[in-house]
């Protein structure tokens, strides 16, 4: 089974690309959805967060106040690392549980949708990494429009993560999401076909041509039938 790591940064459009990948039949494991489930009231992760950050991160209805928690961790790298130490091990365990479930089902490929893929070391556990990229100004404008943050708050949240340009330099494939949905979809379809052994797709990192290709039918390829063990596994997880 082939494992593709999908990442980006806040307001880059990774969720849009993740949804597009489901269309040609990819099994997508959404790390954000796992985090939300693990942080429900009464779970061990929820209780650990409240112990670490105090009752101020709990809403009157007893649920986690993610905005309040976000204000704390995006302003203080030490507090962010404390949160990651609580959340990441539980998320990692659940992701691998789902990967093994898809493997037992005979799925030929799975996409790990992980926002902090590089930061948490998932790039060493997958066959290839795709990064959803936009320029810094587009990212900031989209974040402000989406969340209502001030320009200063938006800049702080963006700065708290590895830059998209750095992620793009490390990536195997880049999805340029500055343009229309149709242009993004064409790149996703082409990259999916290339990952499955066909033609097309965005060039690997380091290439000078990071522009969308024409729409490509996902077509036949290794992703349409049971595949070999992931390259990352055959290399012992070392990229």
Curated annotation (Swiss-Prot):
Extent of Low complexity compositional bias: 204-230
Source taxon at top rank: Bacteria
GO molecular function: ATP binding; dephospho-CoA kinase activity
Organism in which the protein naturally occurs: Symbiobacterium thermophilum (strain DSM 24528 / JCM 14929 / IAM 14863 / T)
Keyword flag Nucleotide-binding: yes
Catalytic activity, as annotated: 3'-dephospho-CoA + ATP = ADP + CoA + H(+)
Record SUPFAM superfamilies: P-loop containing nucleoside triphosphate hydrolases
Pathway: Cofactor biosynthesis; coenzyme A biosynthesis; CoA from (R)-pantothenate: step 5/5
Role played: Catalyzes the phosphorylation of the 3'-hydroxyl group of dephosphocoenzyme A to form coenzyme A.
UniProt domain DPCK: residue ranges: 3-206
Keywords: ATP-binding, Coenzyme A biosynthesis, Cytoplasm, Kinase, Nucleotide-binding, Transferase
Gene Ontology CC annotations of this record: cytoplasm
Keyword Heme among UniProt keywords: no
Binding site for ATP: 11-16
Name of the molecule in the record: Dephospho-CoA kinase
Biological processes, Gene Ontology terms: coenzyme A biosynthetic process
CDD domains given in the database record: DPCK
Gene3D superfamilies, alphabetized: P-loop containing nucleotide triphosphate hydrolases (3.40.50.300)
Stretches for region Disordered: 197-239
EC class of the enzyme, as a word: transferase
Compartmental location: Cytoplasm
Family note: Belongs to the CoaE family.
């Amino acid at each position: 089974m082939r494992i593709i790591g999908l990442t980006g940064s806040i307001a880059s459009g990774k969720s849009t690309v993740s949804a597009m990948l489901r269309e040609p039949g990819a099994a997508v494991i959404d790390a954000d959805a796992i985090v939300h489930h693990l942080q429900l009231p009464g779970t061990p992760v929820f209780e650990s967060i409240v112990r670490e950050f105090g009752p101020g991160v709990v809403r009157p209805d007893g649920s986690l106040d993610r905005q309040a928690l976000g204000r704390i961790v995006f302003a203080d790298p030490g507090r962010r690392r404390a949160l990651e130490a609580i959340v990441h091990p539980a998320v990692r365990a659940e992701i691998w549980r789902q990967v093994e479930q898809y493997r037992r089902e005979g799925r030929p490929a799975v996409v790990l949708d992980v926002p902090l893929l590089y930061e948490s070391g998932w790039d060493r556990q997958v066959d290839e990494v795709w990064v959803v990229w936009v320029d810094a100004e587009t990212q900031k404008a989209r974040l402000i429009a989406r969340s209502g943050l001030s320009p200063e708050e938006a800049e702080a949240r963006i700065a708290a993560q590895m830059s998209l340009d750095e992620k793009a330099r490390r990536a195997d494939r880049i999805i340029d999401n500055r343009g229309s949905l149709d242009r993004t979809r064409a790149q996703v379809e082409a990259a999916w076909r290339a990952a499955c052994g066909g033609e097309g797709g965005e060039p690997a990192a380091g290439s000078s041509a990071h522009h969308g290709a024409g729409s490509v039918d996902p077509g036949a390829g290794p992703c349409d039938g049971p595949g070999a063990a992931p390259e990352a596994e055959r290399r012992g997880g070392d990229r």
